[in-house]
Amino acid sequence: MKRKYIFLWCASFLAAGIFFASFFEFSLFGGGLFLFLSLMGVLSGRVFGKTGAVWVCGALFLCAAGAVRMEMAEEIWRQQSQYIVGSEGTFCGIVAEEPLVYKGEDGYARYLIDLRKIRYADGEEKSISGTVYLYDFAVENKYPVGTALEAEGKLRPLRLYKNPGKIDLEKRYESEHLLGRIYSKENNRIRPAGETGEYRVTRWAETMRERLACSFASYMDPVRLPVLMTLLFGGHYSEIPKDIIHSFSVTGIIHILSVSGSHIALLFGFLYFLGKWLGLSMKVTVVPAVLLVLVYAAMSGFVPPVIRASLMGILAVIGVLLERGRTALNLLGAAVAGMLLWNPYFLFDISFQLSVCASAGILLFYEPLRHALALLGKIPPRICEGCALSTAAQILVLPI
Protein backbone atom coordinates (compact mmCIF):
# COMPACT_ATOMS: atom_id res chain seq x y z
CA MET A 1 0.00 0.00 0.00
CA LYS A 2 1.90 3.07 -1.27
CA ARG A 3 1.76 6.11 0.99
CA LYS A 4 1.70 8.51 -1.95
CA TYR A 5 -1.72 7.06 -2.79
CA ILE A 6 -3.02 7.55 0.76
CA PHE A 7 -6.06 9.59 -0.31
CA LEU A 8 -6.93 7.06 -2.99
CA TRP A 9 -6.99 4.31 -0.37
CA CYS A 10 -8.99 6.56 1.97
CA ALA A 11 -11.62 7.08 -0.72
CA SER A 12 -11.73 3.34 -1.47
CA PHE A 13 -12.29 2.32 2.15
CA LEU A 14 -14.83 5.10 2.70
CA ALA A 15 -16.74 3.88 -0.37
CA ALA A 16 -16.62 0.30 0.93
CA GLY A 17 -18.11 1.40 4.26
CA ILE A 18 -20.85 3.41 2.55
CA PHE A 19 -21.70 0.49 0.28
CA PHE A 20 -21.84 -1.89 3.25
CA ALA A 21 -24.10 0.45 5.27
CA SER A 22 -26.58 0.78 2.40
CA PHE A 23 -27.38 -2.94 2.54
CA PHE A 24 -27.05 -3.79 6.24
CA GLU A 25 -28.75 -2.10 9.18
CA PHE A 26 -26.87 -1.11 12.31
CA SER A 27 -27.23 1.52 15.02
CA LEU A 28 -25.29 4.76 15.06
CA PHE A 29 -24.14 3.86 18.57
CA GLY A 30 -22.66 0.57 17.37
CA GLY A 31 -21.01 2.24 14.40
CA GLY A 32 -19.62 5.01 16.59
CA LEU A 33 -18.25 2.46 19.06
CA PHE A 34 -16.51 0.53 16.27
CA LEU A 35 -15.16 3.83 14.94
CA PHE A 36 -13.71 4.66 18.36
CA LEU A 37 -12.16 1.21 18.84
CA SER A 38 -10.52 1.23 15.42
CA LEU A 39 -9.12 4.70 16.12
CA MET A 40 -7.68 3.42 19.40
CA GLY A 41 -6.12 0.58 17.41
CA VAL A 42 -4.44 3.08 15.08
CA LEU A 43 -3.07 5.10 18.00
CA SER A 44 -1.88 1.97 19.81
CA GLY A 45 -0.14 0.73 16.69
CA ARG A 46 1.64 4.06 16.35
CA VAL A 47 2.75 4.02 19.99
CA PHE A 48 4.10 0.46 19.87
CA GLY A 49 5.53 0.73 16.35
CA LYS A 50 3.22 -1.89 14.81
CA THR A 51 2.96 -0.66 11.24
CA GLY A 52 0.76 -3.54 10.10
CA ALA A 53 -1.72 -2.90 12.91
CA VAL A 54 -1.84 0.79 11.98
CA TRP A 55 -2.75 -0.01 8.37
CA VAL A 56 -5.37 -2.62 9.30
CA CYS A 57 -7.00 -0.48 12.00
CA GLY A 58 -6.79 2.56 9.72
CA ALA A 59 -8.65 0.69 6.98
CA LEU A 60 -11.29 -0.44 9.49
CA PHE A 61 -11.59 3.13 10.79
CA LEU A 62 -12.24 4.49 7.30
CA CYS A 63 -14.78 1.76 6.53
CA ALA A 64 -16.53 2.53 9.81
CA ALA A 65 -16.44 6.26 9.03
CA GLY A 66 -18.10 5.64 5.67
CA ALA A 67 -20.74 3.39 7.24
CA VAL A 68 -21.52 5.89 10.00
CA ARG A 69 -21.73 8.76 7.51
CA MET A 70 -24.16 6.75 5.36
CA GLU A 71 -26.28 5.84 8.37
CA MET A 72 -26.44 9.51 9.37
CA ALA A 73 -27.63 10.44 5.87
CA GLU A 74 -30.27 7.69 5.89
CA GLU A 75 -31.45 8.78 9.34
CA ILE A 76 -32.08 12.27 7.94
CA TRP A 77 -34.04 10.67 5.08
CA ARG A 78 -36.16 8.67 7.54
CA GLN A 79 -37.04 11.89 9.37
CA GLN A 80 -38.64 13.44 6.27
CA SER A 81 -42.45 13.66 6.11
CA GLN A 82 -42.97 10.48 4.11
CA TYR A 83 -46.40 9.96 5.68
CA ILE A 84 -47.89 12.73 3.49
CA VAL A 85 -47.45 10.71 0.27
CA GLY A 86 -50.95 10.20 -1.10
CA SER A 87 -52.30 13.27 0.72
CA GLU A 88 -54.30 15.94 -1.06
CA GLY A 89 -54.33 19.64 -0.22
CA THR A 90 -52.36 22.84 -0.71
CA PHE A 91 -48.61 22.29 -0.49
CA CYS A 92 -46.48 25.31 0.43
CA GLY A 93 -42.78 25.36 -0.37
CA ILE A 94 -39.87 27.14 -2.03
CA VAL A 95 -38.39 26.65 -5.49
CA ALA A 96 -35.02 25.01 -4.76
CA GLU A 97 -33.44 24.87 -8.22
CA GLU A 98 -33.89 26.12 -11.77
CA PRO A 99 -36.82 24.33 -13.45
CA LEU A 100 -36.37 21.71 -16.12
CA VAL A 101 -38.46 22.94 -19.07
CA TYR A 102 -39.77 20.76 -21.90
CA LYS A 103 -41.25 22.80 -24.72
CA GLY A 104 -43.74 21.70 -27.36
CA GLU A 105 -47.39 20.73 -27.54
CA ASP A 106 -47.22 18.63 -24.35
CA GLY A 107 -44.55 20.77 -22.71
CA TYR A 108 -44.21 21.33 -18.99
CA ALA A 109 -41.87 22.80 -16.39
CA ARG A 110 -40.64 20.59 -13.55
CA TYR A 111 -39.74 22.36 -10.30
CA LEU A 112 -37.95 20.95 -7.27
CA ILE A 113 -39.91 22.30 -4.29
CA ASP A 114 -38.57 22.39 -0.73
CA LEU A 115 -41.73 21.73 1.28
CA ARG A 116 -42.57 23.73 4.40
CA LYS A 117 -46.23 23.00 5.20
CA ILE A 118 -49.45 21.42 3.94
CA ARG A 119 -52.94 22.89 4.24
CA TYR A 120 -55.74 20.34 4.11
CA ALA A 121 -59.23 21.00 2.73
CA ASP A 122 -60.65 21.47 6.26
CA GLY A 123 -58.15 24.27 6.96
CA GLU A 124 -55.77 22.23 9.14
CA GLU A 125 -52.09 23.05 8.60
CA LYS A 126 -49.04 20.93 9.35
CA SER A 127 -45.34 21.68 9.10
CA ILE A 128 -43.62 19.15 6.85
CA SER A 129 -40.15 18.49 5.47
CA GLY A 130 -38.87 16.98 2.25
CA THR A 131 -38.95 17.90 -1.42
CA VAL A 132 -41.31 17.17 -4.31
CA TYR A 133 -41.31 17.50 -8.07
CA LEU A 134 -44.01 19.98 -9.11
CA TYR A 135 -45.13 19.71 -12.74
CA ASP A 136 -46.57 22.93 -14.19
CA PHE A 137 -48.07 22.56 -17.67
CA ALA A 138 -48.28 26.35 -18.11
CA VAL A 139 -44.69 26.59 -19.37
CA GLU A 140 -44.89 30.37 -19.80
CA ASN A 141 -45.09 30.79 -16.01
CA LYS A 142 -41.48 30.49 -14.92
CA TYR A 143 -40.84 30.95 -11.21
CA PRO A 144 -37.25 31.81 -10.18
CA VAL A 145 -35.29 30.02 -7.48
CA GLY A 146 -36.22 31.18 -3.99
CA THR A 147 -39.86 31.90 -4.86
CA ALA A 148 -42.48 30.64 -2.40
CA LEU A 149 -45.24 28.67 -4.14
CA GLU A 150 -48.59 27.26 -3.09
CA ALA A 151 -49.70 24.29 -5.19
CA GLU A 152 -53.03 22.49 -4.97
CA GLY A 153 -53.06 18.82 -5.80
CA LYS A 154 -52.30 15.30 -4.69
CA LEU A 155 -48.84 14.12 -3.74
CA ARG A 156 -48.32 11.01 -5.84
CA PRO A 157 -45.62 8.43 -5.02
CA LEU A 158 -42.45 8.14 -7.05
CA ARG A 159 -42.26 5.50 -9.74
CA LEU A 160 -39.14 3.41 -9.26
CA TYR A 161 -38.52 0.98 -12.09
CA LYS A 162 -36.29 -1.99 -11.31
CA ASN A 163 -35.87 -3.03 -14.92
CA PRO A 164 -32.45 -4.57 -15.72
CA GLY A 165 -30.19 -2.03 -17.37
CA LYS A 166 -32.25 0.98 -16.29
CA ILE A 167 -30.64 3.55 -13.99
CA ASP A 168 -31.77 3.06 -10.39
CA LEU A 169 -32.74 6.51 -9.09
CA GLU A 170 -33.79 5.45 -5.59
CA LYS A 171 -30.63 6.70 -3.85
CA ARG A 172 -30.64 9.94 -5.83
CA TYR A 173 -34.21 10.60 -4.70
CA GLU A 174 -33.23 9.86 -1.10
CA SER A 175 -30.29 12.26 -1.41
CA GLU A 176 -32.68 15.00 -2.54
CA HIS A 177 -35.20 14.00 0.18
CA LEU A 178 -37.68 13.58 -2.66
CA LEU A 179 -41.09 12.34 -1.53
CA GLY A 180 -43.15 12.32 -4.72
CA ARG A 181 -44.72 14.32 -7.56
CA ILE A 182 -47.51 16.87 -7.83
CA TYR A 183 -49.17 17.46 -11.21
CA SER A 184 -50.98 20.72 -11.86
CA LYS A 185 -52.87 20.66 -15.17
CA GLU A 186 -55.51 23.25 -14.25
CA ASN A 187 -55.17 27.04 -14.12
CA ASN A 188 -54.69 28.80 -10.79
CA ARG A 189 -53.56 25.60 -9.05
CA ILE A 190 -50.09 27.11 -8.55
CA ARG A 191 -49.83 30.50 -6.87
CA PRO A 192 -46.62 32.45 -6.16
CA ALA A 193 -46.36 33.78 -2.60
CA GLY A 194 -43.41 36.16 -2.96
CA GLU A 195 -39.64 35.96 -2.62
CA THR A 196 -38.11 34.31 0.43
CA GLY A 197 -34.45 35.27 0.20
CA GLU A 198 -33.45 31.60 0.47
CA TYR A 199 -31.24 29.69 -1.97
CA ARG A 200 -29.41 32.91 -2.79
CA VAL A 201 -26.37 31.25 -4.36
CA THR A 202 -28.55 29.13 -6.67
CA ARG A 203 -30.68 32.19 -7.50
CA TRP A 204 -27.56 34.22 -8.28
CA ALA A 205 -26.21 31.46 -10.54
CA GLU A 206 -29.55 31.25 -12.37
CA THR A 207 -29.60 35.03 -12.86
CA MET A 208 -26.03 35.12 -14.16
CA ARG A 209 -26.70 32.33 -16.67
CA GLU A 210 -29.83 34.13 -17.89
CA ARG A 211 -27.93 37.40 -18.33
CA LEU A 212 -25.18 35.63 -20.22
CA ALA A 213 -27.73 33.91 -22.44
CA CYS A 214 -29.42 37.26 -23.16
CA SER A 215 -26.09 38.79 -24.17
CA PHE A 216 -25.48 35.92 -26.62
CA ALA A 217 -29.08 35.89 -27.90
CA SER A 218 -28.58 38.93 -30.15
CA TYR A 219 -25.79 37.12 -32.01
CA MET A 220 -27.11 33.54 -32.12
CA ASP A 221 -30.29 31.85 -33.33
CA PRO A 222 -32.63 30.06 -30.86
CA VAL A 223 -31.30 26.64 -31.94
CA ARG A 224 -27.59 27.27 -31.36
CA LEU A 225 -27.97 29.31 -28.16
CA PRO A 226 -29.06 26.36 -25.96
CA VAL A 227 -26.17 24.31 -27.39
CA LEU A 228 -23.69 27.04 -26.43
CA MET A 229 -25.08 27.39 -22.90
CA THR A 230 -24.96 23.61 -22.46
CA LEU A 231 -21.37 23.50 -23.68
CA LEU A 232 -20.45 26.20 -21.16
CA PHE A 233 -22.37 25.06 -18.08
CA GLY A 234 -23.86 21.63 -18.83
CA GLY A 235 -27.50 20.70 -18.24
CA HIS A 236 -30.48 22.19 -20.14
CA TYR A 237 -30.48 19.20 -22.50
CA SER A 238 -34.26 19.45 -22.83
CA GLU A 239 -33.86 22.81 -24.59
CA ILE A 240 -31.69 21.35 -27.37
CA PRO A 241 -33.58 19.92 -30.39
CA LYS A 242 -33.63 16.12 -30.46
CA ASP A 243 -31.97 15.95 -33.89
CA ILE A 244 -28.97 17.92 -32.60
CA ILE A 245 -28.68 15.68 -29.53
CA HIS A 246 -28.81 12.69 -31.89
CA SER A 247 -26.04 14.19 -34.03
CA PHE A 248 -23.80 14.62 -30.99
CA SER A 249 -24.56 11.04 -29.96
CA VAL A 250 -23.88 9.28 -33.28
CA THR A 251 -20.61 11.19 -33.77
CA GLY A 252 -19.40 10.12 -30.33
CA ILE A 253 -18.91 13.62 -28.90
CA ILE A 254 -22.00 13.94 -26.71
CA HIS A 255 -19.76 13.96 -23.63
CA ILE A 256 -18.67 17.55 -24.42
CA LEU A 257 -22.20 18.67 -23.50
CA SER A 258 -21.41 18.01 -19.84
CA VAL A 259 -18.95 19.95 -17.71
CA SER A 260 -15.79 17.98 -16.99
CA GLY A 261 -12.14 18.36 -16.06
CA SER A 262 -11.33 19.87 -19.46
CA HIS A 263 -13.46 22.92 -18.64
CA ILE A 264 -11.66 23.42 -15.32
CA ALA A 265 -8.23 22.83 -16.91
CA LEU A 266 -8.94 25.42 -19.62
CA LEU A 267 -10.07 27.92 -17.00
CA PHE A 268 -6.98 27.40 -14.84
CA GLY A 269 -4.73 27.50 -17.92
CA PHE A 270 -6.24 30.76 -19.15
CA LEU A 271 -5.84 32.42 -15.74
CA TYR A 272 -2.28 31.12 -15.41
CA PHE A 273 -1.18 32.59 -18.74
CA LEU A 274 -3.10 35.80 -18.02
CA GLY A 275 -1.28 36.16 -14.71
CA LYS A 276 2.05 35.40 -16.38
CA TRP A 277 1.33 38.01 -19.07
CA LEU A 278 0.55 40.58 -16.35
CA GLY A 279 3.78 39.70 -14.56
CA LEU A 280 2.07 38.20 -11.51
CA SER A 281 3.62 35.43 -9.46
CA MET A 282 2.01 32.02 -9.11
CA LYS A 283 1.11 32.73 -5.49
CA VAL A 284 -0.74 35.88 -6.50
CA THR A 285 -2.52 34.19 -9.41
CA VAL A 286 -3.71 31.08 -7.59
CA VAL A 287 -6.14 32.83 -5.21
CA PRO A 288 -8.32 34.53 -7.86
CA ALA A 289 -8.03 31.38 -9.99
CA VAL A 290 -9.46 29.19 -7.21
CA LEU A 291 -12.21 31.73 -6.49
CA LEU A 292 -13.16 31.91 -10.17
CA VAL A 293 -13.31 28.12 -10.43
CA LEU A 294 -15.63 28.03 -7.42
CA VAL A 295 -17.84 30.67 -9.07
CA TYR A 296 -17.88 28.65 -12.28
CA ALA A 297 -18.78 25.49 -10.35
CA ALA A 298 -21.67 27.36 -8.71
CA MET A 299 -22.93 28.59 -12.08
CA SER A 300 -22.75 25.00 -13.37
CA GLY A 301 -24.99 23.76 -10.57
CA PHE A 302 -22.49 21.87 -8.36
CA VAL A 303 -23.32 18.55 -10.06
CA PRO A 304 -20.98 15.60 -9.21
CA PRO A 305 -18.66 15.87 -12.29
CA VAL A 306 -18.23 19.61 -11.69
CA ILE A 307 -17.45 19.11 -8.00
CA ARG A 308 -14.92 16.35 -8.76
CA ALA A 309 -13.20 18.34 -11.51
CA SER A 310 -13.14 21.53 -9.42
CA LEU A 311 -11.72 19.79 -6.35
CA MET A 312 -9.06 18.01 -8.40
CA GLY A 313 -8.11 21.25 -10.14
CA ILE A 314 -7.89 23.21 -6.90
CA LEU A 315 -5.84 20.49 -5.19
CA ALA A 316 -3.49 20.29 -8.18
CA VAL A 317 -2.94 24.05 -8.16
CA ILE A 318 -2.30 24.03 -4.41
CA GLY A 319 0.16 21.17 -4.94
CA VAL A 320 2.03 23.24 -7.55
CA LEU A 321 2.02 26.24 -5.22
CA LEU A 322 3.45 24.23 -2.33
CA GLU A 323 5.96 22.56 -4.67
CA ARG A 324 4.95 19.13 -3.45
CA GLY A 325 5.20 15.92 -5.44
CA ARG A 326 1.93 15.65 -7.33
CA THR A 327 0.15 12.39 -7.98
CA ALA A 328 -2.99 12.65 -10.06
CA LEU A 329 -4.45 9.45 -8.59
CA ASN A 330 -3.97 10.84 -5.10
CA LEU A 331 -5.72 14.07 -6.09
CA LEU A 332 -8.60 12.06 -7.50
CA GLY A 333 -8.78 10.10 -4.24
CA ALA A 334 -8.81 13.31 -2.18
CA ALA A 335 -11.62 14.76 -4.31
CA VAL A 336 -13.67 11.55 -4.09
CA ALA A 337 -13.15 11.22 -0.33
CA GLY A 338 -14.27 14.81 0.22
CA MET A 339 -17.37 14.34 -1.92
CA LEU A 340 -18.36 11.11 -0.18
CA LEU A 341 -18.01 12.69 3.25
CA TRP A 342 -20.14 15.62 2.10
CA ASN A 343 -22.81 13.44 0.48
CA PRO A 344 -22.44 9.64 0.70
CA TYR A 345 -25.30 9.21 -1.78
CA PHE A 346 -22.90 10.34 -4.50
CA LEU A 347 -21.53 6.78 -4.50
CA PHE A 348 -24.79 5.55 -6.05
CA ASP A 349 -25.13 8.40 -8.56
CA ILE A 350 -24.48 7.25 -12.14
CA SER A 351 -22.98 10.63 -13.03
CA PHE A 352 -20.48 10.37 -10.16
CA GLN A 353 -19.64 6.75 -11.02
CA LEU A 354 -18.97 7.47 -14.70
CA SER A 355 -16.98 10.62 -13.95
CA VAL A 356 -14.70 8.97 -11.38
CA CYS A 357 -14.23 5.73 -13.35
CA ALA A 358 -13.39 7.57 -16.57
CA SER A 359 -10.85 9.74 -14.74
CA ALA A 360 -9.30 6.76 -12.96
CA GLY A 361 -9.16 4.77 -16.20
CA ILE A 362 -7.25 7.54 -17.96
CA LEU A 363 -4.81 7.90 -15.06
CA LEU A 364 -4.20 4.15 -14.77
CA PHE A 365 -4.19 2.91 -18.35
CA TYR A 366 -3.39 5.82 -20.68
CA GLU A 367 0.41 5.59 -20.52
CA PRO A 368 0.61 1.76 -20.81
CA LEU A 369 -1.79 1.78 -23.77
CA ARG A 370 0.03 4.63 -25.49
CA HIS A 371 3.35 2.86 -25.01
CA ALA A 372 1.91 -0.42 -26.36
CA LEU A 373 0.52 1.29 -29.47
CA ALA A 374 3.80 3.14 -30.02
CA LEU A 375 5.69 -0.17 -30.04
CA LEU A 376 3.77 -1.18 -33.15
CA GLY A 377 5.75 1.48 -35.01
CA LYS A 378 3.22 2.03 -37.79
CA ILE A 379 0.78 4.33 -36.01
CA PRO A 380 1.44 8.11 -35.91
CA PRO A 381 2.01 9.44 -32.36
CA ARG A 382 -1.09 11.66 -32.40
CA ILE A 383 -3.31 8.74 -33.34
CA CYS A 384 -1.66 6.59 -30.66
CA GLU A 385 -2.42 9.22 -28.04
CA GLY A 386 -6.02 9.65 -29.16
CA CYS A 387 -6.73 5.92 -29.28
CA ALA A 388 -5.02 5.32 -25.93
CA LEU A 389 -6.95 8.13 -24.25
CA SER A 390 -10.31 7.02 -25.62
CA THR A 391 -9.73 3.36 -24.73
CA ALA A 392 -8.38 4.12 -21.25
CA ALA A 393 -11.46 6.19 -20.41
CA GLN A 394 -13.73 3.27 -21.36
CA ILE A 395 -12.03 0.44 -19.47
CA LEU A 396 -13.47 1.13 -16.00
CA VAL A 397 -16.68 2.62 -17.40
CA LEU A 398 -17.70 -0.50 -19.34
CA PRO A 399 -18.89 -2.52 -16.30
CA ILE A 400 -21.18 0.37 -15.32
Residue positions per predicted region:
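Generic recognition of cysteine residues
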Residues: 10, 57, 63, 92, ...
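Membrane-interface helix/helix-cap signal primarily in integral membrane proteins
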Residues: 59-255
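N-terminal leader/targeting segments
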Residues: 1-82
